[in-house]
């Protein structure tokens, strides 16, 4: 009996070590300069095969080897942070109204819908539940969550997951510092820059002066020389590049569907990689992983 207990304990320790090594490896790729490794970020988890932003969708991403999962936050009537993209529950749950008008218990009594709007068995998860599931297994990218920056940080600290979460905002450094300076240096922060819009270069410069972000999320609806020059400018800062391949308006037409439906992966994911991207956010995580593994750009 003692041998069995010792074996089980050893097995648990091995699994814990493997998980810790996984996160360490992803962080090293995110924070360092390793051009031979591309990180895959899955948008709203694996929403094609599970409800978006659900625990099951996140578990699917973990199982397939995704490096980072993107989530969004809202606050309930009684002050809990839950994982939900929309302000209302109309599209993604079997109910109606604003998230902020319901308590957590009321939301938990409802169920999430899948991609074809059918009710499932899955419940809306809290940020705490998500971070406990992801702990030691996968990085987390909080997209729509800047309004809850300090509250989210408290959850990360409580769950021991500060080191595996990225928080983002499309704002100049000075504004972020003023609003969230108390926690800005305690998390991995990523600026979002819309390169095709006025003021993009000023936002880049505001961060270049004050800090070196782990990465910049770059959004652009065209691939004009002006946009390409700004991509180069960010690349030259030494920070990594995060580029979305979700739909054409986010990546100058080099999107997932071009890779999958038009069978042009080199003009999509290949083009993005050639711009120097370290992270690619996708709605096709399994297919992007397959593409990268064939090129030996992912384990």
Predicted feature descriptions by range:
Residues 1-23:
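Bacterial Sec-dependent N-terminal signal peptides
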Residues 19-299:
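Phosphate-group recognition and catalysis centered on beta-loop-alpha active-site segments
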């Amino acid at each position: 009996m003692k041998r069995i207990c010792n074996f089980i304990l050893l097995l648990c320790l091995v699994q814990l070590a493997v998980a810790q090594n996984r996160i360490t490896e992803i962080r090293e790729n995110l924070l360092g300069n390793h051009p031979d490794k591309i990180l895959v970020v899955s948008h709203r988890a694996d929403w094609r095969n599970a409800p978006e932003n659900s625990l099951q969708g996140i578990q699917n991403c973990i199982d397939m080897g995704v490096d980072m999962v993107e989530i969004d936050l809202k606050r309930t009537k009684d002050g809990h942070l839950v994982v939900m993209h929309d302000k209302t529950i109309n599209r993604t749950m079997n109910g109606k109204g604003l998230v902020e008008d319901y308590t957590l218990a009321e939301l938990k009594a409802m169920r999430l819908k899948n991609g074809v709007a059918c009710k499932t068995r899955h419940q809306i998860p809290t940020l705490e539940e998500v971070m406990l599931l992801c702990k030691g297994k996968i990085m987390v990218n909080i997209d729509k969550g800047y309004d809850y920056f300090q509250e989210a940080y408290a959850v990360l600290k409580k769950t021991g997951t500060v080191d595996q979460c990225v928080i983002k905002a499309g704002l100049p450094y000075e504004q972020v510092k003023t609003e969230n300076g108390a926690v800005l240096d305690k998390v991995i922060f990523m600026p979002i820059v819309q390169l095709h819009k006025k003021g993009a270069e000023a936002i880049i410069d505001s961060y270049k002066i004050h800090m070196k972000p782990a990465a910049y999320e770059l959004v652009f609806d065209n691939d004009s020389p002006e946009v390409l020059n700004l991509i180069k400018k960010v690349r030259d800062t030494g920070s990594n590049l995060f580029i979305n391949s979700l739909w054409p308006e986010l990546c100058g037409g080099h999107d997932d569907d071009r890779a999958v439906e038009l069978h042009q992966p080199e003009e999509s994911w290949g083009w993005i990689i050639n711009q120097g991207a370290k992270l690619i956010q996708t709605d096709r995580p399994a297919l992007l992983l397959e593409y990268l593994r064939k090129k030996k750009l992912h384990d």
